[in-house]
């Protein structure tokens, strides 16, 4: 596309219309606006002169000259105001990631279109947006960006930044970027053409390939207020411009106000970063040392594991070889021993077989006898049980007999009582009937007279009845009482007679009962007989009863005697059997007691001799065993000591190799250690002296390395505080030749501070807290300072200075001048050379000290672990001597065992014979008793008789005892008993008749008064009737009582009779059972005496014991036979096995000998036998050695995984059939390590010594770097102090900023201020850092974490409620090292009656928000300038410009306030406003977009403000 356009279609470059709207309006078309430079502390602030837009939509080549205060763009919608501002912003921040012109894209969108609103503002082809600036140095700089649309759907724009310097002020920017090709045509130059054009006019053109370089240039030349190092800085700057452009309070800025207002403390942060970097580097070096140490440990590990791997296998093979030889010898011994045992077992088999046959025969005989004894015992037990039942039944029968007699008497008494009660009851009934008859008679009388008459008649009837009964014809009322007394006396006499007869009758009955009882007892014993023969029979029985009783009492003695005789007979039979057995076993024929006693004496003497020999043998054997046990204990003790002694010998040998000495005694070791301590102390003193010297040199180097030459860092702070410069900094470029002069010229004041005004500084001196003891201040201009302030005269060796009228100072030229950087650098070079020499000497001596310390450590370990054993005798030599002695003792013990075995066999035989004799000798008298059988028969006959009497007494003893006291009653039979009984009956009958007569007479006597009623005796009829009634009632009550008594006596008689019947029935049944039991015991045919059971049991137990003993012996013999037979098979197998094992072991020994010879040859030829033959391993088991070898093999596989040669060698060595390959691997490892030794550093060929020297050197380096790390470390308290000072400084700065905001007013807002506070959580962190809490020091003393991580962990510890998210501790710690994170910033406004409020858009009107937001932005820009002042040139004050779009939202008063603010703060402002805005000050451009045909352009007219003055 052609870059040529018709000028008439775009803009008239030379004849723009000028409209004069006021007399004071001045035409400004195509003429630069008069520009005035304001000063800032004597330095003029840079200004933006103009904005040039080339080939933008509506602007082909338009330059907007910018007012020094306010430039207003006025026009309607679409006039191009936003496009103009967009060109300014694009030239200022050419970053497509940030540019976003929202009012030309989607409203309310955060993303916008893909071109960010820029693509549509450009015309096709090359476009430019250029800013023309003039900085504080009066340099004209044109900075801009070349824009070009990129064809495609994405509507992308390509940007390239550039700058132009050296262009004259008269040169119009438009003419630079265009070329006139005709009278009314011009062409836009591309970038290369522009570059050529600029170079042709003698200016400088520079293109930038990064936005950072572009902004760096703009900062250095004073165009932007802040160095934009990163995208974050550019984003902040763009957000500030955007907030200014669209007005209001930007939440993006207020939310992160700290990042905008508070400067980043780069110095402190860099110091922390440098410190942590140095610590990190130091720790990396330490880690590298650890890696080297791990390599050294790897080599050491390789040597150790290789030695364990090969030496354990070497010693295991040696132990196995020795074990195989011993096993072969042991197998041969077992082979011979098994053959001997086989011969012995065959002899035992024959003997035991013969004994087993004898025991079987004897056992059969004993089984028959035992079964007979068991049967006999069962019969005896049955007889005893029957006898017990018989005895029990006899006792029961005797008891029942007594009870029957007693019960019979009780029944007879009850019967008599019952009959008497019945008679009394009948008599009472008769009397009741008589009384009732009288009452009936009385009742028949109708009145009392009749009653009396009746009574009289009854009395007459009673009198007649009495006469009749008594046979008294002369009985009358007068003599009735006499007769009554007479008959009553007769009745009493008859009663006495009856009682006498009853007494006689009872006596007769007793005699009759005794006779009957005795007769029954006699019949029970002797059977039925006449009553007359009972006395003779009873007499005969009682005569024989005492002898039978005595004979029965002698039955137990007879039984005992018989039992003793039978036992004696059994003993006799047993003794005969023992004698036969003894003769059979001893092959003798001893019969008499004398022969047996003589043989017994001989055996006792033989036993004593054999026992004495055995005792001597046992004592000798015990002595030998004790000696052998002592030797074994000594051997075990030496075996336990041997590994430690061998280890001690190896350690001693290593010490001798390391020290080059030979030690014969422990005292030699102690003396050598003492001498080494003296040498170590001397070298340590030399090392410490060199260390002190090196520290001094480091301190001098550090002091001289200060960039300004100040030796005290406090001077820098004071110079900054006073606004001065250090004198040493002014003379920093002094040559080496002039350095001595100036050093002597200023003398002690060579470290003075040059200030502009001493009076201003003098006021601050009283407030100084931390300063040097002597502080020199010199008044002068730091930019033009010379030595004219002093009056001096140079001499040959020094300088004389006139201090005052009365004071001179003479200073000699220093030998080593330090005034000026050249002198310091020369001195630094000398000090560094000297320091290197001292460091080298220190390193060498430190190495020697480490070497001596390591050697002393080895000696100390040796003294603590091995000194007690190292110089003792060789335990293995002692063990071999002990083994030889033990073998001798074992041979002697074997001989003793053989002899003892023979003696014990003889002793056992003699004891066996003596035991049999001891059983026989006590029974010699039994053997001599020949009439024993006759005595047994005689005793048995006596016992039979006694048992018969005992049985008779047992059966009839109770009966005879009952018969004995009443036997005399049998002498006379009581026959007159019946006559006496008849006489008693007659007497009782007479008594009854007399009593009836007495009763009749008594009735008459009672009725005697009735005889007086013969005529009219009727008065007492009623009384008599009443008496009769009472009499009747009494008689009835008596009758009831007697009836009850009769009933009771009948019941009692029935109960007694029932008991009698039960007793009689029980007596009959038991008597029958007793007879049956007597018959059964007779059928058993055994005697059931007291000792029968015991004798039967003893007999059975004896036979059972003999049978059990015989069976046990037979079982034992059979087991022994089975065992011998099985042992015979086992012995045959054992003989074959031991023979086979012996041959196998012998073959193994022969086969292993070849491989072992190869191993020995390799180890001896390579001088490795001493390392492999570790005797202490010989005392470990094969499993332990194999486990050691396997563990070492696993470690070696890992260790040599990266070494192909060693890996292959190790793989070959794993073949257990070829142990020589392990030795070859051992040699290969040592050869590999020898090749790795650096001979220029380590002067040894032994890898172990090389590792030792490496360890010493690495320990020295580790100690040195650890000390350096301690120096680099920073304390938490110092960090807290730095943070507090920085925060205090920034708080003061914010306070100063607030002073500039006090008079700002927009609408109801009367003032604006910033509120800064320290966060509570971070205040706690500062307190914890500066406090004395020891619980937090563990974090800062931990070398495993950085200081930043320690800060983060401390923050988390004191604020556990805060969620840190996914951020690392290092990230959090770095944030905590930034003081800005400790502060909270808020903007407050003073609005009307509400007072101070938080500045938020919702609480303010639009104009108030715009004004407040502009105030905040001005504060941010001012803060940025202050922040960057230290890193910007001192002669540069940056440009200051802000934007405001849609200014119609501000009222006129606010616009005036804004203009006043710009004037007071020396700030330029670019405003876009509708056409109705016409500010009184500044410059206004009226923009009108015109369309001609298919093309459009913006018509621009510039106006000077109404209030402007020349």
From Swiss-Prot:
- Which domain of life does the protein's organism represent? Bacteria
Q: What is this protein called?
A: Chromosome partition protein MukB
As for family, the record states: Belongs to the SMC family. MukB subfamily.
- Give the GO biological process terms: cell division; chromosome condensation; chromosome segregation; DNA replication
Show the InterPro entries listed in the entry.
Answer: MukB, MukB/SMC, MukB_hinge, MukB_hinge_sf, MukB_N_dom, P-loop_NTPase
Reproduce the free-text note on domains from the UniProt record.
The hinge domain, which separates the large intramolecular coiled coil regions, allows the homodimerization, forming a V-shaped homodimer.
Q: PANTHER family, from UniProt? A: CHROMOSOME PARTITION PROTEIN MUKB, DUF4476 DOMAIN-CONTAINING PROTEIN
- Keywords, comma-separated and alphabetical: ATP-binding, Cell cycle, Cell division, Chromosome partition, Coiled coil, Cytoplasm, DNA condensation, DNA-binding, Nucleotide-binding
For this record, the Gene Ontology CC terms, alphabetical, are: cytoplasm; nucleoid
Q: Where in the cell is it found?
A: Cytoplasm, Nucleoid
Q: Where do the coiled-coil regions begin and end?
A: 6-30, 346-506, 553-611, 673-706, 821-846, 876-1064, 1094-1149, 1249-1304
Question: What is a single Pfam family found in this protein's UniProt entry?
Answer: MukB_hinge
């Amino acid at each position: 596309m052609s870059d040529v356009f018709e000028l008439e279609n775009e803009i008239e470059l030379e004849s723009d219309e000028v409209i004069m709207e006021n007399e004071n309006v001045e035409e400004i078309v195509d003429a630069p606006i008069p520009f005035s430079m304001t000063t800032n502390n004597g330095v003029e602030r840079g200004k933006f002169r103009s904005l040039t837009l080339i080939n933008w939509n509506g602007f082909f080549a338009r330059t907007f000259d910018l007012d020094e205060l306010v430039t207003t763009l006025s026009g309607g919608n679409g006039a191009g105001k936003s496009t103009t501002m967009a060109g300014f912003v694009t030239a200022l921040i050419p970053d497509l990631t940030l540019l976003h012109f929202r009012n030309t894209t989607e409203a309310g969108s955060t993303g916008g279109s893909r071109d960010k609103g820029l693509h549509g503002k450009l015309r096709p082809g090359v476009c430019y947006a250029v800013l023309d600036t003039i900085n504080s140095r009066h340099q004209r700089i044109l900075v801009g960006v070349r824009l070009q649309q990129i064809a495609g759907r994405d509507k992308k724009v390509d940007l390239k930044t550039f700058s132009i310097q050296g262009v004259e002020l008269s040169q119009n920017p438009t003419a630079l970027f265009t070329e006139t090709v005709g009278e009314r045509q011009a062409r836009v130059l591309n970038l290369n053409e522009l570059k050529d054009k600029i170079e042709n006019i003698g200016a400088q053109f520079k293109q930038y390939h990064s936005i950072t370089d572009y902004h760096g240039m703009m900062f250095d030349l004073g165009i932007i207020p802040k160095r934009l190092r990163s995208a974050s800085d550019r984003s902040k700057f763009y957000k500030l411009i955007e907030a200014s452009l669209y007005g209001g309070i930007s939440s993006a800025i207020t939310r992160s106000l700290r990042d905008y207002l508070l400067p980043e403390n780069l110095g402190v942060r860099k110091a922390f970063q440098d410190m942590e970097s140095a610590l990190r580097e130091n720790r990396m070096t330490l880690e590298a040392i650890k890696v080297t140490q791990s390599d050294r440990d790897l080599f050491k590990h390789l040597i150790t594991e290789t030695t364990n791997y090969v030496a354990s296998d070497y010693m295991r093979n040696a132990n196995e070889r020795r074990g195989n030889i011993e096993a072969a010898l042991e197998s041969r011994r077992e082979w011979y021993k098994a053959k001997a045992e086989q011969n012995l077992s065959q002899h035992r088999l024959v003997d035991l077989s013969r004994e087993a046959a004898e025991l079987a025969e004897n056992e059969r005989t004993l089984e028959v006898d035992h079964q007979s004894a068991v049967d006999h015992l069962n019969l005896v037990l049955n007889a005893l049980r029957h006898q017990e039942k018989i005895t029990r039944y006899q006792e029961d029968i005797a008891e029942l007999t007594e009870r029957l007699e007693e019960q019979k008497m009780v029944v007879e008494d009850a019967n008599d009582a019952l009959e008497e009660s019945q008679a009394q009851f009948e008599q009472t009934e008769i009397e009741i009937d008589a009384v009732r008859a009288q009452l009936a008679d009385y009742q028949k009388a109708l009145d009392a007279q009749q009653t009396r008459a009746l009574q009289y008649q009854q009395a007459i009837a009673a009198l007649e009845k009495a006469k009749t009964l008594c046979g008294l014809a002369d009985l009358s009322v007068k003599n009735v009482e006499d007769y009554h007394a007479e008959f009553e006396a007769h009745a009493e006499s008859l009663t006495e007679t009856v009682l006498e007869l009853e007494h006689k009758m009872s006596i007769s009955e007793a005699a009759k009962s005794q006779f009957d009882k005795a007769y029954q007892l006699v019949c029970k014993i002797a059977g039925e007989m006449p009553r007359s023969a009972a006395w003779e029979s009873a007499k005969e029985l009682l005569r024989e009863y005492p002898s039978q009783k005595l004979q029965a009492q002698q039955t137990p003695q007879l039984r005992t005697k018989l039992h003793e005789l039978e036992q004696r007979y059994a003993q006799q039979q047993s003794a005969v059997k023992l004698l036969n057995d003894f003769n059979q076993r001893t092959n003798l024929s001893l019969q008499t007691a004398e022969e047996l006693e003589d043989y017994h004496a001989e055996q006792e003497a033989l036993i004593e001799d054999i026992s004495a020999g055995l005792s001597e043998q046992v004592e000798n054997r015990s002595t030998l065993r004790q000696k052998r046990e002592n030797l074994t204990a000594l051997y075990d003790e030496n075996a336990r000591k041997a590994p430690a002694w061998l280890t001690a010998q190896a350690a001693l040998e290593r010490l001798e190799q390391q020290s080059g000495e030979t030690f014969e005694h422990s005292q030699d070791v102690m003396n050598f250690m003492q001498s080494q301590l003296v040498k170590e102390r001397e070298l340590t003193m030399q090392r410490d002296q060199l260390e002190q010297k090196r520290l001094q040199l480091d301190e001098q180097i550090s002091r001289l390395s200060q960039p300004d030459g100040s030796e005290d860092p406090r001077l820098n702070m004071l110079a900054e505080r006073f606004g001065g410069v250090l004198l040493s900094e002014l003379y920093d470029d002094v040559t080496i030749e002039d350095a001595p002069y100036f050093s002597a010229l200023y003398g002690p004041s060579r470290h003075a501070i040059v200030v502009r005004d001493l009076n201003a500084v003098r006021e601050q001196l009283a407030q100084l807290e931390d300063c040097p003891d002597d502080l020199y201040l010199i008044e002068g201009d730091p930019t033009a300072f010379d030595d004219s302030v002093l009056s001096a005269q140079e001499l040959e060796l020094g300088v004389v200075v006139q201090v005052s009228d009365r004071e001179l100072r003479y200073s000699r030229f220093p030998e080593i001048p330090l005034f000026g950087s050249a002198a310091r650098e020369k001195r630094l070079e000398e000090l560094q050379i000297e320091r290197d020499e001292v460091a080298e000497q220190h390193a060498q001596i430190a190495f020697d000290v480490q070497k001596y310390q390591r050697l002393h450590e080895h000696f100390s370990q040796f003294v603590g672990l091995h000194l007690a054993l190292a110089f003792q005798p060789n335990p293995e030599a002692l063990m071999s001597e002990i083994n030889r002695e033990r073998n001798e003792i074992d041979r002697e013990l074997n001989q003793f065992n053989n002899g003892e075995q023979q003696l014990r066999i003889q002793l056992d035989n003699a004891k066996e014979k003596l035991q049999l004799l001891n059983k026989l000798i006590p029974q010699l008298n039994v053997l001599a008793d020949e009439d024993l059988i006759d005595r047994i028969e005689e005793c048995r006959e006596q016992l039979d008789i006694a048992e018969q009497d005992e049985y008779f007494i047992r059966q009839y003893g109770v009966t005879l005892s009952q018969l004995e006291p009443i036997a005399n009653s049998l002498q006379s039979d009581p026959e007159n008993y019946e006559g006496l009984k008849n006489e008693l009956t007659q007497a009782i009958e007479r008594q009854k008749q007399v009593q009836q007569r007495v009763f009749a007479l008594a009735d008459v006597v009672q009725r005697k008064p009735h005889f007086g009623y013969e005529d009219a005796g009727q008065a007492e009829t009623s009384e008599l009737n009443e008496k009769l009634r009472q009499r009747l009632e009494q008689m009835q009550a008596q009758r009831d009582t007697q009836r009850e008594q009769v009933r009771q006596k009948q019941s009692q008689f029935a109960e007694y009779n029932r008991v009698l019947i039960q007793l009689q029935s029980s007596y009959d049944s038991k008597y029958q059972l007793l007879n049956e039991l007597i018959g059964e015991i007779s059928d058993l045919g055994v005697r059931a005496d007291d000792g029968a059971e015991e004798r039967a049991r003893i007999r059975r137990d004896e036979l059972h014991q003999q049978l059990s003993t015989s069976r046990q012996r037979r079982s034992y013999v059979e087991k022994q036979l089975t065992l011998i037979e099985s042992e015979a098979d086992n012995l045959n197998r054992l003989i074959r096995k031991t023979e086979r094992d012996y041959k196998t072991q012998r073959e193994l020994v022969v086969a292993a000998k070849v491989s072992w010879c190869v191993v020995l040859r390799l180890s001896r030829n390579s001088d490795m036998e001493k390392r492999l033959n570790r005797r202490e391993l010989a005392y470990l088991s094969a499993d332990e050695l194999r486990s050691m070898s396997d563990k070492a093999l696993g470690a070696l596989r890992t260790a040599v995984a990266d070494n192909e040669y060693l890996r292959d060698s190790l793989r070959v060595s794993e073949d257990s059939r070829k142990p020589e390959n392990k030795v070859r691997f051992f040699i290969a490892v040592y050869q590999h390590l020898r090749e790795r030794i650096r001979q220029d550093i380590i002067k040894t060929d032994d890898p172990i010594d090389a590792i030792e020297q490496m360890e010493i050197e690495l320990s020295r380096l580790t100690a040195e770097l650890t000390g350096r790390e301690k120096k680099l470390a920073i304390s938490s308290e110092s960090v807290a102090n730095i943070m507090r000072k920085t925060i205090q400084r920034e708080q003061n700065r914010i306070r100063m900023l607030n002073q500039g905001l006090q008079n700002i007013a927009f609408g109801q807002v009367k003032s604006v201020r910033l509120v800064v506070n320290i966060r509570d959580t971070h205040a706690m962190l500062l307190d914890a850092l500066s406090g004395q809490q020891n619980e937090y020091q563990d974090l800062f003393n931990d070398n495993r974490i950085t200081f930043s991580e320690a800060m983060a962990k401390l923050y988390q510890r004191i604020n556990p409620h805060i969620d840190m998210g996914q951020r690392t501790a290092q990230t959090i710690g770095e944030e905590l090292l930034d003081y800005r994170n400790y502060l909270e910033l808020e903007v407050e406004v003073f609005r009307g009656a509400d007072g101070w409020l938080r500045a938020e858009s919702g609480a303010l009107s639009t104009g108030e928000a715009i004004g407040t937001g502009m105030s905040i932005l001005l504060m941010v820009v001012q803060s940025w300038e202050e922040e960057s002042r230290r890193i910007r040139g001192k002669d540069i004050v940056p440009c200051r410009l802000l934007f405001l779009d849609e200014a119609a939202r501000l009222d006129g008063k606010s616009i005036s306030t804004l203009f006043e603010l710009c004037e007071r703060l020396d700030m330029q402002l670019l405003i876009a406003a509708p056409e109705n805005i016409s500010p009184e000050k500044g410059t206004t451009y009226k923009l009108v977009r015109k369309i001609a045909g298919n093309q459009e352009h913006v018509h621009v007219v510039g106006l000077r403000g109404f209030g402007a003055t020349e």
